[in-house]
Regions:
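UBL (ubiquitin/ubiquitin-like) substrate-recognition surfaces
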Residues: 2-501
């Protein structure tokens, strides 16, 4: 049987008619999503009249026998509409070359749909992962036509695609609706009405859980999350009450490191180390009773993208609320994670780390020479100032990359999506402002990358600041103010990316 084509139908809502396409091969939810984009009535509020009753989310649209030109009646209150832009939205394909060049290095925001800053900030940081964009672009499932997480991943792909077409703010209507359908906690209402504020870390983990089904671009049998966002933790548990009991060894995956914050925590790495050594109580087969154990964790695999959660919220029984820890905790823009790994991994990454540092130092020195020679003809600069021409610099970098690759152990080279050096650079931050977890305001900060085709561009010194639909550019040193110490915006989720040449 040939593939069904979409049918042009009409939807009537509040006396207005809308032209919409209906895909007979999709589910009812897909049609509701299309209605939502036209009428701004969220799918969960819609009552779509069909013969015999109301359209359900899981109804096969092919079974309702829709006809081209048929009119569907829709009942439901529209959500609050985003304010109209002060100037017409200009899409990238309509821009002249010069404007397009500037716009390609700019990113638009996301419209706050009512206490959704937690989601907007999370989505902006997730978007900074280029391998994720590539994997989503190759994903073929459709919203509504697939079940569960597959539909959420498809909605994420469509949202990022729409964001890539314009520099204006985009309302994440469909993705938010899908998230609330799959995870009802994000549909909770506040005491005063409307949707409640949620935890950005919980939103991050739920989205990553859905992305576990996303194929990687390296192979149809591989998955994006295990390759790029999952590490391996080696765990040793030792009974402290019996020297006769042998320690237990095991390994398990992790998707995020926890930075616990105590009265003595001053920096991120010390907080992570504290979380990796725990005291616990469990049954001892040797002693035949409950006994105390010490659990030590070390990282056996470092992923290319490593999120760190600053555990700033804890439950206070006396007031029955989550309370925020305001303590100042510094975090690095560049980070060597080798102090957290197993001895075996430390031995493998040590020569790679040393070689990368050596090459980056030499490149930095050459960049200084190039800067001094700026504005002079290439030939003159090369002779008089010692600066390489662009072509010479590119050739030198190719040589350096080959030398670097030669230092990587075969086991690391074959592990697509791992960090081979242990060196990371900060690329994204979700911050929280306020004293309570269920209140306050989330924002995100994403490193502004140089143009992809400018291989000789110096490292970025600017960051995007995303405050929902408001986007600005700030210098990198502004990040130092996000360490905490007050009720202003403080780092809550950090995303580190493996350094590359």
């Amino acid at each position: 049987m040939g593939k069904m084509t979409t049918l042009p139908v009409k939807v009537k809502h509040n006396g207005k008619m809308y032209d919409i396409s209906l895909d007979p091969s999709a589910k009812g939810l897909a049609f509701k999503q299309a209605i939502a984009e036209a009428t701004h009535v969220p799918p969960e509020r819609q009552k779509v009249m069909i013969k015999g009753g109301l359209l359900k989310d899981d109804t096969d649209l092919g079974q309702i026998n829709a006809r081209a030109g048929q009119t569907f009646m829709v009942i439901g209150a529209a959500g609050e509409l985003p304010k109209a832009p002060t100037k017409p939205i200009q899409f990238l394909e309509d821009m002249p070359d010069e404007a397009l060049s500037q716009a390609q290095s700019w990113r638009g925001g996301l419209v706050n749909l009512g206490n959704t800053c937690y989601l907007n900030s999370t989505l902006q940081v997730l978007r900074s992962m280029e391998p994720l964009q590539e994997a989503l672009a190759a994903y073929t499932a459709r919203v509504g036509a697939s079940e569960g997480d597959a539909s959420l991943v498809a909605a994420l792909r469509d949202l990022y695609r729409d964001m890539g077409k314009t520099t204006e703010a985009v309302p994440p209507l469909v993705f938010l609706s899908m998230l609330r359908k799959l995870a009802p906690q994000f549909a909770e209402t506040a005491e005063g009405g409307g949707f409640a504020q949620q935890d950005a870390e919980e939103a991050w983990m739920r989205i990553v859980q859905a992305l576990a089904i996303l194929p990687a671009t390296t192979s149809p049998n591989d998955r994006f999350v295990p390759q790029y966002l999952s590490g391996t933790m080696a765990i040793e548990r030792q009974c402290v009450e019996s020297s006769d009991e042998a320690p237990t060894q095991l390994k398990e995956p992790f998707h995020m490191l926890q930075c616990t914050i105590s009265s003595t925590t001053n920096d991120m790495e010390s907080g992570i180390k504290d979380s990796m050594t725990q005291q616990l109580e469990k049954h001892s087969d040797t002693l035949q009773r409950a006994a105390s154990y010490e659990e030590k964790r070390r990282i056996a695999r470092l992923p290319a993208f490593l999120p760190v959660h600053f555990v700033r919220f804890y439950w206070r029984r006396d007031i029955q609320k989550k309370t925020k820890i305001m303590r100042k905790v510094k975090f690095p823009k560049e980070w060597d994670a080798s102090a957290l790994v197993t001895p075996e991994l430390a031995e493998l990454i040590a020569p790679v780390r040393s070689k990368m540092r050596e090459i980056l130092k030499e490149r930095d020195e050459r960049a200084k020479v190039r800067a001094r020679a700026k504005g002079r003809p290439d030939e003159a600069a090369a002779v008089e100032g010692g600066a390489l021409t662009d072509e010479q610099e590119k050739a030198q970098r190719a040589k350096e990359k080959a030398e670097f690759e030669a230092t990587i152990d075969a086991s690391l080279r074959s592990d697509a999506g791992c960090n081979v050096s242990g060196l990371y650079e900060l690329v994204g931050i979700v911050t929280h402002k306020g004293a309570a977890a269920d209140a306050g305001h989330y924002m995100s900060w994403v490193r502004k990358e140089p143009r992809a085709d400018d291989v000789l561009a110096p490292p970025s010194t600017e960051w995007f600041k995303f405050n929902d639909d408001q986007v600005s550019v700030v210098p990198a040193d502004k990040l130092d103010s996000l360490s905490g110490g007050g009720e202003d915006s403080v780092a809550y989720l950090l995303l580190y990316r493996a350094k590359t040449l």
